[in-house]
Swiss-Prot record:
Belongs to the enolase family. This is Enolase. Mg(2+) binds at D246, E290, D317. The keyword NADP does not apply. One of its GO terms (biological process) is glycolytic process. Keywords: Cytoplasm, Glycolysis, Lyase, Magnesium, Metal-binding, Secreted. It comes from the Bacteria. Component of the RNA degradosome, a multiprotein complex involved in RNA processing and mRNA degradation. The keyword Lyase applies. The lineage of its organism: Bacteria, Pseudomonadati, Pseudomonadota, Gammaproteobacteria, Enterobacterales. Pathway: Carbohydrate degradation; glycolysis; pyruvate from D-glyceraldehyde 3-phosphate: step 4/5.
Length: 432
């Protein structure tokens, strides 16, 4: 009943109005899985390739008809008749057929959309919710937890048209008893933040990930206005709610220095920028920093890990790009202590699960993440619960492309009840 009988690829639109790949996998017995590939703005240089057409007369060159043709042609032909329950086998067929290190032949956007659609179809054929099927694929059947959200309520960097260098300022409602209550707390802080910004005459337009994108006097001012909003919402900063940042430092790394426009174009060395961040962690309860240096600055990361790694979570995104080869090297060299998991960085569900397992086995945490270009596809919610990853980054409390994931988590928590505990602060590296 789980034999693949039809595969369909199509071009749809993402949350930025750009095309992306959606795939359907149909099985015997009428079971269907459908999934769409997300797309990033600040991307690591070693990510799997997102195949775009480059035809400037169509979607400004961002069309994905070549990737869609790969789904409807060679990929479909290769997996028709195969057993959808063999996820590793299906993914291997596509990866081998593509034949490149970075999936540049078919595009990671094509392979991932089919990979996820296949998992959804297989789950349906087994009569299981997607998170339960993922737990089985992960070798951890029935082991679930609800993730602590990192809610990106102030957007800067590549995600917003403002003067803030650091790309994401996030809140984590660690004091909540459940995921649903964490979402409520996040929503309340989000609305109070709008009031705080308006009272200061600041813009409350939102960026790609649904957070506000005001012009601020400095990067520290973003933390200050969030602290004000947390207090106004009736919560205690550091106890009920902790803070996290994604520096996306590769975006302001120029000629070996970190140049911050929000700090008067000041240029920092790796060590100086590490201490700039350390000072912020002393002023505010920041418990997680992502991509605190450039992806190629491994010596700098070793220093940053030495200075901050036993106090807070240091997450590698552009640094590790969900790639087990790069992560393995990072673990061996003691670089960071956590990995951001974006399945389009590597391009298949099987490889994503391998990265999560490698991280956990090494004592690193794994933070499941959206991309800045998203769709209504909420697979990452099921991935977070099904792997018991413990943390999720899926944007702010606005834009349906972000909220779709929170709503799916609320549904899953309702279905699982006490089977999926919300562990709060304990999930964050260095905070247990």
């Amino acid at each position: 009943m789980s034999k693949i009988v039809k595969v369909i690829g199509r071009e749809i639109i993402d949350s930025r109005g750009n095309p992306t790949v959606e795939a359907e996998v149909h099985l015997e017995g009428g079971f269907v899985g459908m999934a769409a590939a997300p797309s990033g703005a600040s991307t690591g240089s070693r990510e799997a390739l997102e195949l775009r057409d480059g035809d400037k007369s169509r979607f400004l060159g961002k069309g994905v008809t070549k990737a869609v043709a790969a789904v409807n042609g060679p990929i479909a032909q290769a997996i028709l008749g195969k057993d959808a329950k063999d996820q590793a086998g299906i993914d291997k067929i596509m990866i081998d057929l593509d034949g490149t290190e970075n999936k540049s032949n078919f595009g990671a956007n094509a392979i991932l959309a089919v990979s996820l659609a296949n998992a959804k179809a297989a789950a349906a054929s087994k009569g299981l919710p997607l998170y339960a099927h993922i737990a089985e694929l992960n070798g951890t059947p029935g082991k679930y937890s609800m993730p602590v959200p990192m809610m990106n309520i102030i957007n800067g960097g590549e995600h917003a048209d403002n003067n803030v260098d650091i790309q994401e300022f996030m809140i984590q409602p660690v004091g909540a008893p459940t995921l649903k209550e964490a979402v409520r707390m996040g929503s309340e802080v989000f609305h109070h933040l709008a009031k705080v910004l308006k009272s200061k005459g600041m813009n409350t337009a939102v960026g790609d990930e649904g957070g506000y994108a005001p012009n601020l006097g400095s990067n520290a001012e973003a933390l200050a206005v969030i602290a004000e909003a947390v207090k106004a919402a009736g919560y205690e900063l550091g106890k009920d709610i902790t803070l996290a940042m994604d520096c996306a430092a590769s975006e302001f790394y120029k000629d070996g220095k970190y140049v911050l426009a929000g700090e008067g174009n000041k240029a920092f060395t790796s060590e100086e920028f590490t201490h700039f961040l350390e000072d912020l962690t002393k002023q505010y309860p920041i418990v997680s920093i992502e991509d605190g240096l450039d992806e190629s600055d491994w010596d700098g990361f070793a220093y940053q890990t030495k200075v901050l790694g036993d106090k807070i979570q240091l997450v590698g995104d552009d640094l590790f790009v969900t790639n087990t080869k790069i992560l393995k090297e990072g673990i061996e060299k003691g670089i960071a202590n956590s990995i951001l998991i974006k399945f389009n960085q590597i391009g298949s569900l099987t490889e994503t699960l391998a990265a999560i397992k490698m991280a956990k086995d090494a004592g690193y945490t794994a933070v499941i993440s959206h991309r800045s270009g998203e769709t209504e596809d909420a697979t990452i919610a099921d991935l977070a619960v099904g792997t018991a990853a413990g943390q999720i980054k899926t944007g702010s409390m606005s834009r349906s492309d972000r909220v779709a994931k929170y709503n799916q988590l609320i549904r899953i928590e309702e279905a699982l009840g006490e089977q999926a505990p919300f562990n709060g602060r304990k999930e964050i590296k260095g905070q247990a």
